[in-house]
Amino acid sequence: MISIQQAEPHHRDGWERLWRQNIVNFGAPDMPDDVIDGLWQRILDPDHAMQAWLAIDGTNDDHTVVGLAHLIIHPHTFSLRNVAYLEDFWVSPDHRGGGIGGLMMTALQKQAKQNRAARKDGFPPARE
């Protein structure tokens, strides 16, 4: 069973494994460890705009992280409401095609709504 959860400290290893896959795929394989550490600290800081949402496979004992998304909720100049910006989205290649991306997008849409986002940037159009 797949669950979508906001990242917590114990998710670090699984998040980092997927994050490194993502940055290699998008051409930044040499990202320094201190940048990755700083990103993780931002994600865990409740006062920071950046959030990480993870797809967790609960069918095994280690609850493997199989998907990640970075969501940034921030103010903008055209409304007093926030904007939800989808910065990164990655599903482990060996878990693609099973609906995990759709589950994650549903959870991210819900999070944007809960944060009263006036607009959602970086979100792909819904697929049928």
List the predicted regions and their residue ranges:
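Conserved residues at the C-terminal ends of beta-strands
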Residues: 72, 92, 123
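Conserved beta-strand edge residues that scaffold enzyme active sites
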Residues: 33, 126-127
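Conserved GNAT acetyl-CoA-binding A-motif
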Residues: 112-125
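A short, internal acetyl-CoA/4′-phosphopantetheine-binding micro-motif in the GNAT/acyltransferase core
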Residues: 89-96
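Acetyl-CoA-dependent GNAT
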Residues: 2, 6-81, 87, 111
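Short, cationic motifs built from Arg/Lys/His that form the positively charged side of catalytic pockets
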Residues: 5, 96-97
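Conserved acetyl-CoA-binding loop-helix of GNAT-fold acetyltransferases
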Residues: 97-110
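Short coil/turn motifs at secondary-structure junctions
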Residues: 74-76, 94, 127
